[in-house]
Amino acid sequence: MHLLPELASHHAVSIPELLVSRDERQARQHVWLKRHPVPLVSFTVVAPGPIKDSEVTRRIFNHGVTALRALAAKQGWQIQEQAALVSASGPEGMLSIAAPARDLKLATIELEHSHPLGRLWDIDVLTPEGEILSRRDYSLPPRRCLLCEQSAAVCARGKTHQLTDLLNRMEALLNDVDACNVN
């Protein structure tokens, strides 16, 4: 289920392409939920800027896939099906996991908080009925900015930071993880 970093497209995605890609992801999620009546983990990489598919995002994605598989194994949860693909919005993974949806969401939240790359992962858990379990459902604050600890949404809307600074921080986090062999 890993993606080859050297095959990244480096395509600068437009807003309309991004919106179509998100609609297509939602349609794929519904197909998966019909095929597997268990919770679905939908996993993407948080990538600022217009280039969503790069060597860096694919390497970050691959670490996330490894961490999600390890989480399922540790908890004794069966992965019924898994797939990876690349869309206009970057690397995407889907894993149908036989586990209680709320427990799965809590475990993925903990993974996002505990793993050094967790802030670069967007891990959604959908119930078998298609409901997305949100951070708000667990009274958690919004995602923090990579650079200043403010709300990431506020910094993104206000263009508080230079794109190069955000991308450099992403790459530094990835290089630290690779240097320490963290999965």
UniProtKB/Swiss-Prot annotation:
The gene is citX. It comes from the Bacteria. It catalyses: apo-[citrate lyase ACP] + 2'-(5''-triphospho-alpha-D-ribosyl)-3'-dephospho-CoA = holo-[citrate lyase ACP] + diphosphate. Transfers 2-(5''-triphosphoribosyl)-3'-dephosphocoenzyme-A on a serine residue to the apo-acyl carrier protein (gamma chain) of the citrate lyase to yield holo-acyl carrier protein. InterPro entries: CitX. GO terms for molecular function: holo-citrate lyase synthase activity. Keywords: Nucleotidyltransferase, Transferase. Its EC number is 2.7.7.61. Signal peptide: none annotated. This is Apo-citrate lyase phosphoribosyl-dephospho-CoA transferase. GO terms for biological process: prosthetic group biosynthetic process. It is an enzyme of class 2 (transferase). Belongs to the CitX family. Induction: Repressed by H-NS. Part of the citCDEFXG operon. HAMAP family: CitX (MF_00398).
